[in-house]
């Protein structure tokens, strides 16, 4: 397991401010660990492709859990059972009913877009622009995720899929889902703490589009994900060359 403790301007170490329990994620996947201004712990596990796990203290959120993808079998048994499962949209690399069942426990909330719920036959529907309080100091807002390049619009139509912006005691994390650098991003919060942007043309963004989106969002940390064969090193190189000040973290696990 790789563990990183990352402390940015809005993720200050204030251990005396909070006695909340936080169990380290003990998994083979890379984990980044942050502290909120209120002293809570945020852990993010880089599982594979579009699948990540976010733990706020001991409250675990699985995003797009898929057990088998790209010839790999993911070790979800290494994680605690999820308190919440969030699905961005209904494609097979995001929605897998068997994996949802495997990571869930009694009382797990499963939240997804309408087409995913229709396809799965279960789930709590959440649409673009809607917000939910998942737990104390844990909120999520569904934001648009769609294609805009001519000829690609049918892959992810506008108004269907979700990205998710999490507010974790003021620590902002964005998982884009399958999207391009859509105009809506201009209205998203600027300076979010951690942003996951999908980058695998022709389904989501090119490396150039990912750079453009990052320059609009201006996050503290960017993690390109849902990568496929994208040259993720180019994303980092271009942002560094532009003097963006964005800390770009690259993971082969997210191909």
Question: Could you tell me what each predicted segment is?
Answer:
Residues 62-66, 82-93, 110-114, 174-177, ...:
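Active-site neighborhood of phospho(di)ester-bond hydrolases with catalytic His/Asp-centered motifs
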Residues 15-17:
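C-terminal motif of bacterial Sec signal peptides marking the signal peptidase cleavage site
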Residues 73-135, 139:
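Active-site HxH/HxHxD metal-binding segment of metal-dependent hydrolases
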Residues 124-138, 158, 211, 215-255:
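Binuclear metal-ion centers of metallo-dependent hydrolases, dominated by the metallo-beta-lactamase
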Residues 148-216:
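Active-site-proximal loop/helix segments of hydrolase catalytic cores
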Residues 19-21:
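Bacterial signal peptide processing site
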Residues 23-39, 47, 112-171, 249-255:
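Metallo-beta-lactamase
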Residues 25-39, 47, 51-90, 97-101, ...:
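Pre-active-site segment of Zn-dependent metallo-hydrolases
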């Amino acid at each position: 397991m790789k563990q990183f403790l990352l402390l940015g301007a809005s993720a200050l170490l204030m251990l005396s401010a909070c006695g909340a329990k936080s169990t380290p994620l003990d998994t083979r996947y890379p984990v980044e660990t942050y502290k909120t201004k209120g002293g809570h712990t945020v852990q993010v596990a880089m599982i594979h492709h579009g699948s990540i796990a976010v733990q706020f203290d001991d409250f675990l959120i699985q995003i797009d859990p898929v057990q088998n993808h790209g010839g790999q079998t993911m070790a979800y048994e290494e994680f605690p059972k999820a308190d919440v499962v969030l699905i961005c949209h209904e494609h097979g690399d995001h929605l897998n009913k068997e994996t949802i069942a495997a990571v869930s426990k009694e009382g797990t909330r499963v939240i997804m877009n309408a087409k995913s719920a229709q396809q799965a036959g279960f789930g709590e529907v959440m649409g673009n622009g809607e917000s939910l309080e998942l737990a104390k100091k844990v909120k999520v807002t569904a934001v648009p995720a769609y294609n805009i390049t001519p000829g690609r619009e049918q892959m992810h139509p506008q108004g269907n899929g979700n990205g998710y912006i999490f507010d974790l005691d003021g620590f902002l994390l964005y998982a884009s889902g399958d999207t391009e650098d859509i105009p809506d991003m201009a209205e998203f919060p600027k300076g979010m703490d951690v942003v996951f942007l999908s980058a695998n043309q022709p389904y989501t963004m090119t490396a150039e589009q990912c750079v453009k989106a990052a320059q609009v969002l201006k996050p503290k940390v960017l993690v390109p994900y849902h990568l496929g064969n994208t040259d993720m090193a180019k994303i980092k190189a271009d942002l560094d060359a532009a003097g963006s000040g964005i800390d770009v973290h690259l993971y082969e696990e997210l191909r």
